[in-house]
Amino acid sequence: MQAKAVARTVRIAPRKVRLVVDLIRGKQVGEAIAILNHTPKTASPVVEKVLKSAIANAEHNYEMDINSLVVEKVFVDEGPTLKRFRPRAMGRASQINKRTSHITVVVSEKKEG
């Protein structure tokens, strides 16, 4: 059985979130939370919040044991891009892309054996 949680349109670039997400893939949830608490990246608290939501979903909706949960899948997709303009020299302007992320965390119970 799997439980998942998704955070959509988070205002952090997907490339930066993937650096954090790669640290917790395949880890037990307690270990994953400890790693996120000690990772000095802007995306860490956001990923931790999604992970805790997935854990709560597993416990409440599927009655899984929290102590046996493992981060089975975690991935980041690109959300809608906010386009802004920065004034440049000689009356020009250049485009700035403020990227957003969709963060998905899937937890499941660890197989015995």
UniProtKB/Swiss-Prot annotation:
Domain of life: Bacteria
Keyword RNA-binding (UniProt): yes
SUPFAM superfamilies: Ribosomal protein L22 (SSF54843)
This protein's UniProt keywords: Ribonucleoprotein, Ribosomal protein, RNA-binding, rRNA-binding
Example of a GO cellular component annotation carried by this entry: cytosolic large ribosomal subunit
Keyword Ribosomal protein: yes
InterPro entries named among the record's database cross-references: Ribosomal_uL22 (IPR001063), Ribosomal_uL22_bac/chlpt-type (IPR005727), Ribosomal_uL22_bac/org-type (IPR047867), Ribosomal_uL22_CS (IPR018260), Ribosomal_uL22_sf (IPR036394)
GO terms (BP aspect): translation
GO MF term (any one): structural constituent of ribosome
Function description: This protein binds specifically to 23S rRNA; its binding is stimulated by other ribosomal proteins, e.g. L4, L17, and L20. It is important during the early stages of 50S assembly. It makes multiple contacts with different domains of the 23S rRNA in the assembled 50S subunit and ribosome.
Family membership noted in the UniProt record: Belongs to the universal ribosomal protein uL22 family.
Oligomeric form and interacting partners: Part of the 50S ribosomal subunit.
The name this protein goes by in its record: Large ribosomal subunit protein uL22
Organism: Bacillus anthracis
